[in-house]
Amino acid sequence: KRMTKIGIYGMAVWLLSACGNGTPDYDATGTFEATEVIVSAEAAGKLLQLEVEEGTRLKAGEEVGLVDTVQLYLKKLQLEASMKSVESQRPDLAKQIAATKQQITTAQREKKRVENLLAAGAANQKQLDDWDAQVTLLQRQLIAQESSLMKSTNSLTEQGNSVSIQVAQVEDQLNKCHIQSPIEGTVLAKYAEAGELASVGKPLFKVGEVDRMYLRAYVTSEQLSQVKLGDKVTVYSDYGNSEQKAYPGVVTWISDRSEFTPKTILTKNERANLVYAVKIAVKNDGSLKIGMYGGVVWKKENP
């Protein structure tokens, strides 16, 4: 409650000082905020590196830390060895059935020779029937051999696919050991240090996109019709000592639900119990800070 009273008092003092210095009567007030992301560990292990400090500027995708990868790397080597073992067991179909095919070719040649001899009266029907049976037997053996080899090949293929998936999983886990900034921005807080043990989900640092700030202001239902997405407005910031500065802003979001007026916010209509939140994007010149009070004036040319 004490903090709420301080917030209300601070907002009231700022509004009174702004009015006393010729600043336009604000249509809405609020506080500045930025897009903030808490970067958490995606892998468990010893935190070998975390090269960020509060105020550090980061680019999107920039690597800033590393979780120990030794065990995962060894597991990957083991899986790769298993993959080589599986591949070495894969049969060479052509070589495996080459001998049987050669036997079939030889038997067919002998069968043809006996057919010619039988036609010349130099062989009997039983000899021809024997070679015919031999060819049929060898052909059946070839079919059975091919079927067995295909089953073995398919089984090895499935084993190989399973190992490949496990390798991909380990590679994904290895990638997650490399800590990166998801957005371009400034480090706002640091929650861990190199040498500590990281667990999945452990917060490491917070980064904020402070180059573009947002004034979260609140309007009454009567004012809502005056505000549209894309409207250009003028935003005023509070630098203390009755010093304000104007910034061009653009309305980027309007809540579709009303809420009770936050206790730290003063509205155009002091009796309004329900308000709608709006967000106004402002390019930061380096002076705007998260949590700073601000006001907004709708430009008359907005339709």
Task: List where the protein language model places each region.
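C-terminal motif of bacterial Sec signal peptides marking the signal peptidase cleavage site
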Residues: 15-18
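Bacterial signal peptide processing site
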Residues: 20-22
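Extended amphipathic alpha-helical segments
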Residues: 24-27, 74-89, 93-95, 102, ...
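Long, amphipathic coiled-coil "stalk"/hairpin helices in large membrane-associated assemblies
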Residues: 25-89, 120-127, 189-193, 220-222, ...
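Surface-exposed patches in structured soluble domains
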Residues: 31-32, 47-53, 57-63, 168-173, ...
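Short, solvent-exposed secondary-structure boundary/capping segments
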Residues: 40, 257-268
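Short, surface-exposed secondary-structure boundary micro-motifs
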Residues: 63, 69-70, 203, 209, ...
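Surface-exposed connector loops and short turns at secondary-structure junctions
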Residues: 219-248, 272-296
